[in-house]
């Protein structure tokens, strides 16, 4: 129940303008098709924000103060692990260059990155779910940190990947992400200190995008 209340609060705050939303409307400059999206990502210059892969829905984080206690966390299920691998394989098949990868400190986010085959991975509190175990000010700080990462241009010729959690994504981006699914990617282009959403992709769709790139 506390998690539901928090999400409802996030939506209410967004509606009242208390959360900073994407500086342009969702899909204001969408990429038109799979081939165009693959081409855009091959050129680099994007930030790919991913909610961690599929998990066991009947499990919870029982030691949320200790992200290193993997056994006490809601971890990836077999489908989540398989899709994380296919996500990384699809990016490589499509020739998408991945540079820096930032993840939550929780294992379900970090494992999504490692199974995808990413190498330059850094865990950060900025992407870690705080929920009710950190202060509202800290949750707000993390939301702002996520927005700053979205607005930061990657190293030339690469794309940055961020792997986080639903509450963090809602806090940072608002009510349009209230139904963000496990494994879903929101792809942004940093632009003049802001960020433009160009596509939202489910993890099951990446092999199709890779095929279109050929």
Region spans (language model):
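Bacterial N-terminal signal peptides
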Residues: 13-22
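Sec/Tat signal peptide C-region and signal peptidase I cleavage site
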Residues: 24-28
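Active-site-proximal alpha-helix that buttresses catalytic centers in soluble enzyme cores
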Residues: 30-126, 130-134, 142, 176-186, ...
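A short, structured loop/turn motif at beta-sheet edges
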Residues: 153-158, 191-193
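Generic beta-sheet signal
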Residues: 45-47, 155-164
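A short, acidic, amphipathic alpha-helical segment used as a generic capping/interface helix at domain edges
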Residues: 144-154
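Histidine-centered catalytic micro-motifs
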Residues: 50-55, 162-169
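N-terminal secretory signal peptides and thylakoid transit peptides that target proteins
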Residues: 2-14
